[in-house]
A protein has these predicted regions:
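Positively charged n-region of N-terminal signal peptides that target proteins for export
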Residues: 1-5
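Ligand-binding pocket scaffold of soluble enzyme catalytic domains
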Residues: 52, 124, 197
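The substrate-binding groove and active-site-proximal loops of carbohydrate-active enzymes
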Residues: 99-104, 140-148
């Protein structure tokens, strides 16, 4: 009986140790596993990187910065299976489609964003949109934000350094399908409204930027909002 009990205890300790080791695995190792062809290995690594917040996203960006730089310099380059796994991991960690262009990390839980805002002293920039920021066919405005604003080096630097980023789907984006009658179909969104709110750490709206802006204009309103509405850090 004592031998059986000892064996069971040993197995339990080994199982717990394995779980703890994975949870404490260095982020660099998680970044490698995140693009594994084995989903059973990739998905837990992606979830762990996501739980690390912006630091997890930056680890992934730094690990694959050579590949990212090549695809930014050559946008017409045919995607390899490895590149598709890299972008899938980046988008899952960041919760933004084509996030390799911006390197931004978006919270999808407002309460979590508020806690980070209170701890960091940064205001929250909350994007409310139709669809999700990870969707290929999110609302037209959010697609513009991804391709023109968030990918801009000056804009992404301000967003990353001065704000806690949060996105929230208000409702699914309306879609229209055009059937050409010959087997071809075209699916497009039919509305595109979205808005950026500036929130304090209590979630109170203190500013709003509806509609679309060019990168320079958006940078100006962001800087102004960051200076005026910066909350006090809670100790």
């Amino acid at each position: 009986m004592r031998v059986k009990f000892s064996l069971l205890s040993l197995l339990f300790v080994l199982a717990v140790s394995t779980q703890v080791t994975f949870a404490k695995e260095p982020a660099e190792g998680l970044a490698v596993k995140a693009i594994s062809e084995n989903n059973a290995e990739a998905m837990p690594a992606i979830e762990e990187l996501r739980s690390l917040g912006p630091a997890g996203m930056q680890t992934l960006m730094h690990r694959y910065d050579d590949e990212i730089a090549r695809h930014i310099a050559n946008p017409g380059m045919a995607p390899t299976p490895e590149w598709l796994r890299i972008t899938a991991a980046l988008d899952a960690v960041s919760q933004q489609r084509n996030s390799y262009l911006s390197g931004l990390y978006w919270y999808t839980d407002l309460e979590q964003a508020q806690r980070v805002s209170a701890q960091s002293g940064k205001p929250i920039l909350s994007l409310r949109l139709l669809g999700k920021l990870t969707d290929e066919l999110s609302c037209a405005n959010s697609r513009f934000f991804r391709t023109v604003l968030y990918s801009n080096a000056a804009v992404s630097s301000i967003l990353r350094d001065q704000f806690v980023l949060h996105s929230q789907m208000v409702r699914p984006v309306p879609l229209i399908t055009i059937d050409f009658g010959d087997g071809r179909k075209l699916e497009r969104t039919i509305t595109g409204n979205s808005v950026h709110y500036v929130l304090d750490s209590d979630g109170k709206v203190i500013d709003a930027f509806p509609g679309v802006y060019g990168p320079q204009a958006f940078s100006r309103v962001l800087r102004r909002a960051g200076l005026i509405h910066k909350p006090q850090r809670k100790r």
